[in-house]
Amino acid sequence: MRDPVTGFVYPAAWVEKVSDPAGLEKVRGGSAVLTSSGTVLLRGYTTGTTAAAACKAAILSLAGDISRVTIQLPCGLSADLPVKARAGHASCRKYAGDYPSDVTAGIEFIADAAVAQKGILLVPGPGIGHFVRDTPRYKKREPAISTAPLACILSSMEEALGATGLSGATVTLSIPEGRTIADQTLNPRIGIEGGISVLGSTGLVEPWDDHLEDSVIARVAGATDPVITTGRVGLRYARLLFPDREVVLAGGKIKGALAAAKGEVTLCGLPALILKYIEPHILDKTGYATVEELAASPSFPSVALPILVAYKKKHPRVRVVLVNREGTVIAESP
């Protein structure tokens, strides 16, 4: 059985331990993951997916009441989400799945749609954060809506427009609790103010709890010369860079994954999590608020390379390969 989201092939021994056939079907469909103990854990939906559902429902409700919508996720799967929508006003609450630490769990997204002359327009409202300075990917005052979820939201709005037969619609998206919840996220420390970010490269939230960590460790321990990566972007490019190796998505569980790995290990992904793991104080005295900003600056090589050299001396069997969002290798161990 293969996970349709990550591509990971579940060992037969894990599948045999599952006592819930319905849960196994969810794993097969991608809405859940399977752990080494046979436990089935549900994936949740990202802020981007929730926003897309609210926006789509708002437009659809201009033609009648709506209680559920189907969203085509960035990962290629589809998801059916409950909504409350009537007369252009829609509400959708974020479902966290089996991820108890999700501070945005249950948060409400509100979308208000109005008929327009032609095409679609998304207006970010209260509760959606905005950038307070220019960054490598966003300009000052731009809303904190990442590329993949923005595309998902806009395509969902287009689908709704086609279904209603309307020629155009403007949707204002807001998150009433966004400003308050943002204080519990990293946004204030990375130059985003006014609310939370709308994120989600796959549209799904991974259930990173202790059970899944055990499975990550089991995946790494069972591989020869594994490649460990921290996120979806890293996963995609690691598979391209190392097609003959087992690539394991470890999220923030880098320490445990490295400890379990056998043979020569490659740690591959975007610089932020990896460099912060290797050197927690990497940003000290650099003048940058995030590793992403540092990585886009001319001073990055002079900061990163000495750190990678020192780490290689301390951990000679671990090779570090850092990539940017376009898949270019921007730094690696000597």
From Swiss-Prot:
Pathway it works in: Cofactor biosynthesis; adenosylcobalamin biosynthesis; cob(II)yrinate a,c-diamide from sirohydrochlorin (anaerobic route): step 6/10
Q: Which Pfam families match?
A: CbiD
> Glycoprotein: present as a keyword of the record?
no
Q: Which reaction does it catalyse?
A: Co-precorrin-5B + S-adenosyl-L-methionine = Co-precorrin-6A + S-adenosyl-L-homocysteine
The family line of this record is: Belongs to the CbiD family.
Q: Which NCBIfam families match?
A: PRK00075.2-5
Q: What is this protein called?
A: Cobalt-precorrin-5B C(1)-methyltransferase
Query: In which organism is this protein found?
Result: Methanoregula boonei (strain DSM 21154 / JCM 14090 / 6A8)
